[in-house]
């Protein structure tokens, strides 16, 4: 399982991908839009789950990512 932390801003999303041992596999920034999220999700190691702080900018991201996440 891979664990992804998101730091969501109005125009960008910073991310960090770690494995179960805590080793960082990837860090970066993508644009905060559906097209970039779709591209980014295709590049992620499987399976994965995500965590992010709930802010005014995160509602649509949660809704967009939810169908792609593996249930616990």
Language-model segments: residues:
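Phosphate- and other anionic-substrate recognition elements at nucleic-acid/protein interfaces
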Residues: 1-72
């Amino acid at each position: 399982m891979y664990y992804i932390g998101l730091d969501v801003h109005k125009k960008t999303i910073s991310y960090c991908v770690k494995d179960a041992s805590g080793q960082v596999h990837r860090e970066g920034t993508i644009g905060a839009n559906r097209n970039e999220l779709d591209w980014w999700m295709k590049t992620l190691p499987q399976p994965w789950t995500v965590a992010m702080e709930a802010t005014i900018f995160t509602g649509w991201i949660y809704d967009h990512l939810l169908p792609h996440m593996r249930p616990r």
